[in-house]
Amino acid sequence: MNIGTLTINSSLALAPMAGVTDVAFRQICAELGAGYTITELISSKALCYHDKKTLSLLQQFPGEHPAAVQIFGSDPICMAEAAQIALEHSGADVVCLLYTSPSPRD
């Protein structure tokens, strides 16, 4: 399977799961055959605020490739900044952007 020029050499891909797909879980899944790993959903606003706990969600294990970071939010400017932060802090091959409707909390 290919995502653009990125080749995934396994038919198994890890789905993003909030509170589950931390770096240790992703490494176990890769060792068991997952050919593609992805972080849990990460808030673009938390990345834009450089929240330490949120930045820790970007951690990768050595050799974690191909790998993706999944970011959600409703502010296009913050989403763009968060994508850049994710690339700088993670080394991910793919950044998935999930745009949401603005809510009263935004």
Language model segments and positions:
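Conserved small/polar residues in nucleotide/adenosyl-binding loops
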Residues: Y99-D106
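An anion-binding catalytic pocket shared by soluble metabolic enzymes
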Residues: L14
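Membrane-interfacial amphipathic/re-entrant helices at transmembrane-helix boundaries
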Residues: L6-T7
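Extreme N-terminal starter segment of soluble prokaryotic enzymes
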Residues: S10-S11
